[in-house]
Curated annotation (Swiss-Prot):
The gene is gtfA. GO terms for cellular component: cytoplasm; plasma membrane; protein N-acetylglucosaminyltransferase complex. InterPro entries: GtfA (IPR014267), GtfA_EBD (IPR054396). It comes from Limosilactobacillus reuteri subsp. suis (strain ATCC 53608 / LMG 31752 / 1063). Pfam families: Glyco_trans_1_4, GtfA_EBD. Keywords: Cell membrane, Cytoplasm, Glycosyltransferase, Membrane, Nucleotide-binding, Transferase. N-acetyl-D-glucosamine binds at H251. It is a peripheral membrane protein. This is UDP-N-acetylglucosamine--peptide N-acetylglucosaminyltransferase GtfA subunit. It is found in: Cytoplasm; Cell membrane. Required for polymorphic O-glycosylation of the serine-rich repeat protein (SRRP) in this bacteria. Catalyzes the first step in glycosylation by transferring N-acetylglucosamine from UDP-GlcNAc to serine residues in the substrate protein. Part of the accessory SecA2/SecY2 system specifically required to export serine-rich repeat cell wall proteins encoded in the same operon. The GtfA-GtfB complex adds GlcNAc from UDP-GlcNAc to SRRP (experimentally characterized with a truncated SSR1 construct); the alpha linkage was shown for this enzyme but not the residues glycosylated on SRRP. The keyword Glycosyltransferase applies. GO terms for molecular function: glycosyltransferase activity; nucleotide binding.
Amino acid sequence: MTVYNINLGIGWASSGVEYAQSYRAQAFRNLNISAKFVFSDLILGNNIADLTANLGFNADQIIWLYNFFTDIKIAPSTFLLDTFVEQNHLEQRNFSLLPNNGTKELQYKSEEEKLTIVPRYNNREKQTIDQVTYIFNNRLIKRDFYSYTKYATEYYSGEEKDNQVIFREFYNENGTIAYTQHLDGDGHELFEFPDQNYYSKTDLYREMLRKFNFKADDIIILDRMDEDKQLVNGQLIFEHHLPAKLVIPVHADHYDKHYTNDHQVLWNNFYEYQFMHYQDVAAYVVATDRQRDLLASQQKHFNHAKPQINTIPVGSLEHLVKPKGTRKKHSLITASRLANEKHIDWVIEATVAAHKIVSDLTLDIYGEGGERSRLQNLITKNNADSYIKLMGQHDLKDVYQKYETYIAGSTSEGFGLSLMEAVGSGLSMIGFDVPYGNQTFIVDQQNGYLLPYTEDWSNSRKEQLLADAIVKNFTEADLTSFHEKSYSLAESYLTKNVAKQWQQLIGELQHA
């Protein structure tokens, strides 16, 4: 039996879906269940093995569409700079190494060949590289990609104004070309193999599914589908998953309440296809009981259907994290992508207001995203740089325990992994009474404050509610009691307990 987990892309700053897969991978490892994680985006900015290892995946768990048709293994970048220099005879060809200013890129230049070769360090200390760029007459013409060997090359048109990739080669271990991807510049592509051509990425994906040769005891967990305009993967999986069982996790609010009434429902567009084809789905998995009950009632009302819906948290805790010392007094932490929908600006404004009463109050904001500069400007505008800080991207598992309280401004979380990790470190919690994460991890007056929320309220009213809760939390609340309640809530999210829920579902599906 193998569990195939279907995704599209992954990066250094991943979303909740990738983190959910990472937690699931850990649960499956604990159960000794064979699991594969399938990615189909063209991921060349970094070695996919490095990106997935960053989230705790094992390299042998990863299947990447573009690598699948070669015999090169998914593996870390271990190719040495010295090996590259030697193999390409750079010294004999009289290439000179230009002074390096400490960046990840080196420049080898030949005036005679009018060529600059730019290897990029993957790890400067280990002297390993993951990319090499070739610039001829000041124009990019080629880029090679390395793990333990060269696995791909992309070739550019070399034009002055519209220099774009015209084809890519993907290699086998012995250096032979496994296949070539041709691009016409208008979004069309052709994958040329020695014995066959595939005229779209969708066709190539279909061939990969065919080669998986699904068995009756296999399970496919479809985490993401159809965000890539070059690929229609969701429909393909619905069409070709048999005899395996198909499971659909719901990672977000699954419908739009503004356009839903007794006569119609507007499903979240990322899940509409999956909900309308419920006959093909062995089970839906949601993160909270509240979402399970709502989805079940909507399926019954609108589709006259009664599909199997299981509650399994998308995250889990290896263990409860107790503070190694004294928690920093009057300290707030929040962690998320720096995106508009997270409403971190409300949290900043609330902290500024509360700071007037709790004078040693601090807020540390963890995460990266497109809103970073705007949020920094807001902090500076409020003269709050001394007590509100953007901390960047970090592994927070052992960071939460340094703080007293977690605060969330988000008004919609399918689950809220950072909320789970915060209660697992015993923090008191502040957030709005909105589906589904806050309602799961905040018990009002017991481990924090679950604040009333109406969308139509002004931002200043929402900010004031948060500010009042901050002040109350640090001036009136029994934080020791709040911290103990958070630890108690977190018990059911320990990996060993979540793994049992997966084990039960998989057992049911195998015997269905």
